């Protein structure tokens, strides 16, 4: 499937209609879903109706925006009015939101065509999309492997060309890690740049919505459409949103890039290390000045995250009590209704994190765990602040390995958690981070390179990512799927 700008040109030149583009995407979904299981809900009728409206505008010689008529996928933890929003959980299997999230409303207003809701780890808690209460999504590059998580459905849908772009959410790497595993571009914006209103909360101080795309330009276009201040979100930043495509330049002269020393240590697959180092060499050729940077507290990100995030989750998920929405298991007393419903509605990983968080917040352990984790978070932020006094952009691997086999880590939570080792500190710092394809391993599995910039410096990420993309062809490779 073509890029956003290419499809836009085809539409305005009347080479193709929006209905034709939408039908092509829906046909591809129908063909690939038995293999991939990327989507939980497909909204074919609404998509075709929206496409007809775009075609009517074109027929009336009205101008159309860049996203009008462009097929998109939405992670199923963003509320969509009249369309099921399950968060990949059985506890919300019958939930149809009465309102629209800010980001999906912005996409509607931009004329984008929503094809459906994509699969995810239950309540976005996971790194493989295997904890979904409904289905396991496959990696388009190797159907026996995971697409990453928690936004695995969106990553797989974009990589397999079921849709042009998609939205995901990122709490500890849930956009960037699956982007790496699936060989696409994935961006976690600065915390507060994109409204969280209507995003079902996992860890409110860490969650952020962002784009998946096959090209850097498409990611820039999609971010421009969803970013911006929202009075409905108290953490929303009131800043001017630029046209991010203006930063897409092919050279990197005078740009200073830092390689995070601590990310090239124990646990990193040597092939991933070599591939990312080759990516760094390419950045040098493009004119960037590269130096090694130390972020000594980076390695404490994982344990701090797995106290802070579950603590916030234990509070956020207390609302699922079977009273106003979601499934309800009948019982003799109110308390037993709560416990029976939650016991049957939540999956194992969600229960594990609720228990972890409740323990960390309990009276006897609050200072020893939660408060200490927040202090570590502050130290990690200080590491980043010091690094950005010396360089413009930081570079490291997105994930320690390529995609692992389905079922390989389901019985070993710690091993699963380690796949977010490189991405978690970025969320703790509230910084923007982007994964871009930078090569493949011997099995033909994609490898991602992570770019990190200071708060609200997405412009630098787009500049570096675009220059690298234009000098390489990794983003042009396609997974071995039926065409």
Swiss-Prot record:
Gene3D superfamilies: Amidase signature (AS) domain. GO terms for molecular function: ATP binding; glutaminyl-tRNA synthase (glutamine-hydrolyzing) activity. It catalyses: L-glutamyl-tRNA(Gln) + L-glutamine + ATP + H2O = L-glutaminyl-tRNA(Gln) + L-glutamate + ADP + phosphate + H(+). PROSITE patterns: AMIDASES (PS00571). Its EC number is 6.3.5.7. Disulfide bonds: none annotated. One of its GO terms (cellular component) is glutamyl-tRNA(Gln) amidotransferase complex. The active site is at 75 (charge relay system), 150 (charge relay system), 174 (acyl-ester intermediate). It is an enzyme of class 6 (ligase). NCBIfam families: gatA (TIGR00132). HAMAP family: GatA. PANTHER family: GLUTAMYL-TRNA(GLN) AMIDOTRANSFERASE SUBUNIT A, TRANSAMIDASE. Belongs to the amidase family. GatA subfamily. This is Glutamyl-tRNA(Gln) amidotransferase subunit A. It comes from Gloeothece citriformis (strain PCC 7424). The lineage of its organism: Bacteria, Bacillati, Cyanobacteriota, Cyanophyceae, Oscillatoriophycideae.
């Amino acid at each position: 499937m073509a890029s956003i700008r290419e499809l836009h040109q085809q539409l305005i030149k009347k080479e193709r209609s929006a209905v034709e583009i939408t039908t092509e995407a829906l046909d591809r979904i129908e063909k690939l879903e038995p293999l991939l299981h990327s989507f939980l809900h497909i909204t074919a009728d609404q998509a075709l109706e929206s496409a007809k409206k775009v075609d009517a505008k074109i027929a009336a010689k009205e101008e159309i925006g860049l996203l009008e008529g462009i097929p998109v996928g939405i992670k199923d933890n963003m509320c969509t009015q009249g369309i099921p929003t399950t968060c990949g959980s059985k506890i919300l299997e019958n939930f149809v939101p009465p309102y629209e999230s800010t980001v999906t409303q912005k996409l509607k207003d931009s004329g984008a065509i929503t094809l459906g809701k994509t699969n995810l780890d239950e309540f976005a808690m996971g790194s493989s999309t295997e904890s979904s209460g409904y289905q396991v999504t496959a990696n388009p590059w190797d159907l026996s492997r995971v697409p990453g998580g928690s936004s695995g459905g969106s990553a797989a849908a974009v990589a397999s060309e079921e849709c042009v772009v998609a939205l995901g959410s990122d709490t500890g790497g849930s956009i960037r890690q699956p982007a790496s595993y699936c060989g696409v571009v994935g961006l976690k914006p600065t915390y507060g740049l994109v409204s969280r209103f209507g995003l079902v909360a996992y860890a409110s101080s860490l969650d952020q919505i962002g784009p998946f795309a096959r090209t850097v330009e498409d990611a820039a276009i999609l971010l421009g459409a969803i970013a911006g201040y929202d009075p409905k979100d108290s953490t929303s930043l009131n800043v001017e949103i630029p046209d991010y495509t203006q930063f897409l330049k092919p050279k990197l002269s005078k740009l200073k890039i830092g390689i995070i020393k601590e990310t090239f240590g124990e646990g990193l697959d040597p092939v991933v290390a070599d591939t990312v180092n080759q990516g760094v060499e390419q950045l040098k050729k493009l004119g960037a000045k590269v130096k090694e940077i130390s972020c000594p507290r980076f390695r404490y990100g994982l344990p701090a995250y797995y106290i802070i995030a579950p603590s916030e989750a234990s509070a956020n998920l207390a609302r699922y009590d079977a009273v106003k929405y979601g499934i309800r298991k009948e019982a003799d007393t109110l308390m037993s209704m709560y416990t029976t419903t939650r016991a049957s509605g939540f999956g194992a990983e969600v229960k594990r994190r609720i228990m972890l968080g409740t323990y960390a917040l309990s009276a006897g352990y609050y200072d020893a765990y939660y408060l200490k984790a927040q202090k570590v978070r502050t130290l990690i932020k200080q590491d980043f602040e010091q690094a950005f006094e010396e360089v413009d952009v930081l570079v490291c691997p997105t994930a320690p390995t390529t995609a692992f086999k389905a079922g390989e880590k389901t019985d070993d939570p710690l091993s699963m958690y380690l796949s977010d080792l490189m991405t978690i500190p970025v969320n703790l710092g509230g910084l923007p981070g982007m994964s871009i394809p930078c090569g493949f391993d011997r099995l033909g599995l994609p490898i991602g390179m992570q770019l990190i910039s200071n708060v609200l410096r997405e412009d630098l990420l787009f500049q570096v990512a675009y220059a690298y993309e234009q000098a390489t062809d990794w983003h042009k490779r396609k997974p071995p799927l039926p065409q």
